[in-house]
Design a protein with these regions (language model features):
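TPR/TPR-like (Sel1-like) alpha-helical repeat modules
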Residues: 486-488, 568-569, 610-613, 647-655, ...
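Hydrophobic, well-ordered secondary-structure elements that form the walls
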Residues: 593, 633, 645, 673, ...
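Phosphate/oxyanion-binding loops and surfaces in catalytic or ligand/nucleic-acid-binding neighborhoods
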Residues: 61-64, 71-78, 166, 220, ...
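Alpha-helical adaptor scaffolds
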Residues: 359-367, 398-401, 432, 590-637
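Acidic, proline/glycine-rich low-complexity intrinsically disordered segments
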Residues: 41-44, 95-555, 560-563, 567, ...
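Terminal, low-structured helical/coil segments at or just beyond the last alpha-helical repeat
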Residues: 663-690
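An N-terminal, helix-rich hydrophobic module
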Residues: 1-115, 119-120, 224
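C-terminal structured "cap/appendage" subdomains that terminate the fold
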Residues: 634-666, 671
Length: 690
């Protein structure tokens, strides 16, 4: 017999003598039991899905360790003792070499077996997780009255909301599935795009006080119908239908439903059918975020629902969130902030354990009060009850970047994208993170992903344009974007948004003028600004001011001093009017400072600019605060305070901000610094010296 054969025979004899076989079998049986128990218990304890995968990974890593310990030690009546080594006892170099070889071979065998087990087991867990995932597609409205489309949307939204409360399920957000309305795709294609194992589709017919609902649950892997259900009930039974559906879907997908989750699903949001109908229409307009007019219409419908049912906690919570958004994006006035606080508190008073009420309180603390830690605590409570709500992760990420926690912010925004993969608003927010960090490769990757979903997104195209200017001073992307966005959607042969909204039209006009100014095409900028009356620029908050201000800049560059002074004076009047409505709004204070600087009012401009930075310092807001610092630097540069301007710009270039070397080379506001040697040194310090 060869030496190797003798060695292997001895090795297997040692495994038997040291009871390694017995330990290996016992370990496999015990590990299998632990995995089975964890699969059943972890969802009931509301632990995240990754905890099960971590448990399996630790068990796999522990297998070779258990084998080595079994080789080295033995359990005797006297306790645990080191197993005597017969080979070493007989002496000889050869035996000692064989001993080391045995230990190495044992460890290697354990690792190989663990790796093989992991190869087969981990994909099974991932597949199991994919099976416990669902997209609820928009329901088809079969009612003769097309107004009932809101009702069909409400049914879909409520079913989705109920399912999203189940932690053991992955539920794709409403925003990411709405693109499939009237857009026939196979369940397999939808499942692949959204990363889900099942798709729910259905139709709703409402006639008088009766509602008929037909739903089908489809396996996204095979396109096979798992089950179908027809409901023909009184309108008052609509909540019972939604509850029944959520429980049946969870059962079909083998998702564990905790007692707390079941209680939340069984709870009716309101007993008043008319209040519910007003609520679903309000929710549809609210979530679309199409225009300020639509948001104000949604506000009135929420108020109608609350008037019909003053204890309608979900309506109170949604109205609070709406008021917070209006305060943040349109009207930063005290009355909006107080309304957001009040409605959130009423929702909590009415139903303290409603996750949406804590979400509303989180929004109010974030947008209204800038109390970030308190807001995150409320959102953590909301997340426990809404584990699949992308909105929660999105707002968490938005808050964290204002705290300067860029890594945590990016992780939460990535999580939101996982729950809402087709939501370009979430992708846009993630791209802003990378822009501030000057990671242009990642920013462009995210923007391109969004444009693949919505090829005519005004915000994404303009962000992509800004990225090219920020990084390289390249206007090619901007010119392409502006030309594309000016084309009618149908004529351009593109899917996505058709007619531009009033806000998008304003943004397009202002962006066209701004790009022309940066390129030194002052006559073109002026022609764009004068191509429409002031009303055409009112679709965006601050749009009229920006029009007048940029007109002043263009006239000054063209040597039209009288026209420049007139435009800046009108811009000043507009800035003062906007500031009177919201005196504590930092951007409005900044706008007044910028125009005062152009009018030669040096001291007033500096004081106003400093006030803006005090209202929104970087220590309070690491995301928007740098913009106020950059504005103060701009004012210093315009009024001839070069040293102060350069000091601020140096700091902004050294940390996350929207200021870049390429942009400073182009910005007309920096013209008075260009001949300053220190400015050139600053550009060389952070740039390539070109």
């Amino acid at each position: 017999m060869s030496t190797n054969a003798i060695f292997l025979t001895g090795f297997f004899d040692e495994l038997k003598r040291r009871k390694v076989y017995r330990v290996a079998v016992a370990y496999v049986i015990a590990a299998g039991g632990v995995i089975q128990l964890a699969s059943a218990v972890f969802p009931a304890w509301e632990l995240p899905n990754w905890t099960l995968r971590l448990t399996v990974l630790l068990l796999l890593v522990g297998f070779p360790i258990a084998l080595i310990l079994a080789w080295a030690y033995d359990v005797t009546p006297s306790g645990i003792r080191m197993t005597p080594n017969l080979a070493l006892a007989t002496g000889g170099v050869s035996n000692r070499v064989h001993h080391r070889r045995n230990v190495f071979l044992l460890g290697l065998s354990g690792l190989i077996l663990a790796a093989v087990a992991g190869f087969f087991l981990m994909p099974r867990l991932t597949a199991l997780n994919a099976e416990k995932s669902i997209a609820v597609l928009p329901f088809e409205n079969l009612s003769a009255d097309k107004q009932n489309a809101y009702f069909a949307d409400g049914i879909q939204d409520d079913i989705l909301t109920n399912l999203s409360k189940i932690r053991d399920l992955k539920v794709i957000s409403r925003t990411s599935v709405m693109g499939y309305r009237g857009n026939p795709s196979s369940a397999r294609a939808i499942g692949k795009t959204l990363g889900v194992g099942a798709v729910l589709e259905g139709s709703v017919r409402r006639e008088g006080n009766r509602v008929r609902l037909n739903v089908q649950l489809i396996d996204a892997e095979t396109d096979r119908h798992l089950w179908a259900e027809d409901y023909d009930r009184e309108l008052t039974d609509v909540f019972a239908i939604q509850t029944d559906l959520a429980q049946k879907i969870a059962q079909e997908l083998q998702a564990q439903l905790s007692a707390r989750e079941k209680e939340q699903i069984l709870r009716k949001p309101t007993e008043n059918g008319e209040a519910y109908f007003a609520f679903v229409q309000a929710s549809s307009w609210h979530t679309s975020l199409e225009s300020f007019d639509k948001l104000k219409a949604a506000e009135q419908l929420y108020l109608r629902a609350i008037q019909l049912d003053p204890k309608f906690s979900l309506a109170l919570a949604n109205l609070s969130i709406l008021e917070s958004w209006i305060f943040h994006a349109f009207e930063p006035v005290e009355v909006r902030r107080e309304l957001a606080r009040s409605y959130a508190q009423r929702a909590l008073d009415s139903q303290p354990d409603l996750p949406d009420a804590h979400l509303a309180r989180g929004y109010s603390l974030y947008y209204g009060d800038r109390e970030y830690d308190a807001a995150l605590r409320e959102l953590a409570i909301a997340e426990r009850g809404l584990p699949n709500d992308a909105q929660v992760s999105l707002v968490m990420g938005a808050i964290q970047r204002r705290q300067g926690q860029w890594q945590e912010s990016t992780a939460d925004l990535e999580k939101a994208i996982g729950l809402s993969p087709n939501d370009v608003w979430v992708l846009e927010n993630l791209a802003y993170n990378y822009q501030m960090l000057r990671d242009y490769q990642e920013a462009n990757r995210v923007v391109d992903r969004g444009l693949a979903i919505e090829p005519r997104s005004t915000n994404l195209w303009l962000l992509k344009s800004r990225l090219a200017i920020d990084e390289r001073g390249d206007f090619g992307v901007a010119e392409k974007a502006l030309n594309l966005l000016r084309q009618p959607a149908i004529g351009a042969g593109l899917k996505g948004k058709g007619e531009l909204s009033a806000e998008d039209r304003t943004i397009l006009l202002l962006s066209s003028a701004n790009v022309a100014l940066l390129q030194g095409k002052y006559e073109e900028a002026l022609a764009t600004l004068e191509s429409a009356e002031d009303d055409a620029f009112s679709g965006k908050p601050g749009g009229v001011f920006e029009k007048r201000f940029m007109a002043g800049l263009a006239h000054r560059k063209l040597g039209h001093e009288a026209e420049s002074q007139a435009a800046f004076s009108k811009a000043k009047e507009q800035a003062e009017a906007e500031l009177r409505a919201a005196p504590n709004d930092a951007p409005r204070n900044a706008n007044l400072a910028r125009v005062l600087a152009r009018l030669g009012k040096k001291d007033a401009a500096i004081a106003q600019a400093k006030h803006a930075t005090e209202l929104l310092p970087e220590s309070v807001d690491a995301f928007a605060g740098p913009e106020m610092t950059a504005m103060l630097a701009e004012v210093y540069a315009v009024v001839g305070e070069n040293a102060n301007a350069l000091g601020l710009l140096d700091g902004l270039l050294s940390r996350p901000s929207g200021v870049t070397v390429a942009l400073l080379r182009l910005d007309p506001a920096m013209d008075q610094l260009r001949d300053d040697r220190r400015f050139q040194e600053l550009l060389q310090k952070y740039g390539d010296g070109s």
